[in-house]
């Protein structure tokens, strides 16, 4: 029986990965709709943002964190929400941090280079530096830690790895990873977890960045569908 309908874009949409991963692990069958902004979708999210969710019982949710927490909580024995209230609060803390202080800034670095919004070299550089400031916080935090919260995998790891996958898809080549070994180690660890790998494309790392702060070569309408969709929607939920 279908548990609910999830509205998203095709491919590894950065704010949807954790939702898909936890749903699959919990045995919850989701009807994945990859053509957003249909009337049904807009009845849930008036702004047409993804992800959006409607349960088989007609319960509606938008905002990625809310959906991820709701899907995870369907398993009352889950270990993904922490061992106690403090760990639960930390999980939400890191989800919020990545969702606001990394993804939003990173997409302002990304969208101009994809030709989705006007390109300005100084603005791209500004947002790249702002993103790195936030990533530096995580890099320092992970110096002597394997997981973001506690001593086992949590929803924070799944959700935040999905968020920062944009960086590893477009920007984070070998040189960057050498300069940010803790974040890189953590990201690779999460990507190889069966729960995460089961719903994502084959894991690959860049040797060189795909984008290095240059004007887009293609017009917006010819930007690869998946890359543009991932980038645009990363700013919207």
From Swiss-Prot:
Stated EC number for the protein is: 2.5.1.-
Detail which positions bind substrate: 49, 108
Annotated GO MF terms: transferase activity
Tell me which GO cellular component terms the UniProt record holds. Answer: cytoplasm; nucleus
Q: Which Pfam families match?
A: GST_C (PF00043), GST_N (PF02798)
* Involved pathway(s): Secondary metabolite biosynthesis
Cross-referenced InterPro entries, in alphabetical order? Answer: EF-GSTs, Glutathione-S-Trfase_C-like, Glutathione-S-Trfase_C_sf, Glutathione_S-Trfase, Glutathione_S-Trfase_N, GST_C, Thioredoxin-like_sf
The family this protein is said to belong to: Belongs to the GST superfamily.
Primary role = Glutathione S-transferase; part of the gene cluster that mediates the biosynthesis of pseurotin A, a competitive inhibitor of chitin synthase and an inducer of nerve-cell proliferation. The PKS-NRPS hybrid synthetase psoA is responsible for the biosynthesis of azaspirene, one of the first intermediates having the 1-oxa-7-azaspiro[4,4]-non-2-ene-4,6-dione core of pseurotin, via condensation of one acetyl-CoA, 4 malonyl-CoA, and a L-phenylalanine molecule.
What is the protein name for this chain?
Answer: Glutathione S-transferase psoE
Output the lineage of the source organism. Eukaryota, Fungi, Dikarya, Ascomycota, Pezizomycotina
- What does the UniProt induction comment state? Expression is induced under hypoxic conditions.
Q: Where does glutathione bind?
A: 37, 49-50, 63-64, 99
Q: Where is the GST N-terminal domain?
A: 2-79
Q: Which UniProt keywords apply?
A: Transferase
Residues folding into a coiled coil are: none
User: What happens in the null mutant?
Assistant: Abolishes the production of pseurotin but leads to the accumulation of deepoxy-synerazol.
Q: Where is the composition biased (Basic and acidic residues)?
A: 208-222
Q: Which organism is it from?
A: Aspergillus fumigatus (strain ATCC MYA-4609 / CBS 101355 / FGSC A1100 / Af293) (Neosartorya fumigata)
Q: What class does this enzyme belong to in the EC scheme? A: transferase
Tell me the segments the record calls region Disordered: 208-237
Domain GST C-terminal positions: 84-222
The cofactor required is: glutathione
């Amino acid at each position: 029986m279908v548990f609910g309908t999830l509205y998203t874009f095709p491919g590894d949409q950065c704010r949807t990965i954790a939702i898909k991963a936890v749903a699959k692990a919990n045995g919850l069958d989701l009807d994945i709709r990859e053509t957003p902004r249909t009337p049904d979708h807009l009845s849930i999210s008036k702004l047409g943002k993804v992800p959006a969710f409607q349960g088989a019982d007609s319960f509606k949710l938008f905002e990625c964190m809310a959906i991820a927490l709701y899907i995870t909580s369907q398993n009352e024995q889950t270990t993904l929400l922490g061992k106690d209230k403090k760990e639960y609060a930390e999980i939400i803390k890191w989800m919020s941090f990545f969702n606001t202080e990394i993804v939003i800034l990173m997409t302002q670095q990304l969208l101009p280079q994809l030709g989705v919004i006007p390109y300005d070299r100084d603005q791209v550089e500004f947002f790249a530096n702002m993103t790195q400031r936030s990533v530096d916080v995580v890099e320092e935090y992970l110096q002597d830690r394997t997981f973001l919260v506690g001593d086992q995998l949590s929803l924070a790891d799944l959700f935040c790895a999905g968020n920062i996958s944009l960086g590893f898809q477009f920007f984070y080549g070998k040189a960057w990873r050498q300069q940010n070994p803790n974040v890189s180690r953590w990201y690779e660890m999460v990507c190889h977890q069966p729960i995460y790998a089961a719903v994502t494309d084959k894991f690959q790392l860049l040797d060189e960045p795909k984008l290095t702060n240059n004007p887009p070569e293609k017009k917006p309408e010819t930007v690869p569908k998946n890359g543009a969709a991932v980038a645009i929607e990363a700013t919207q939920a």
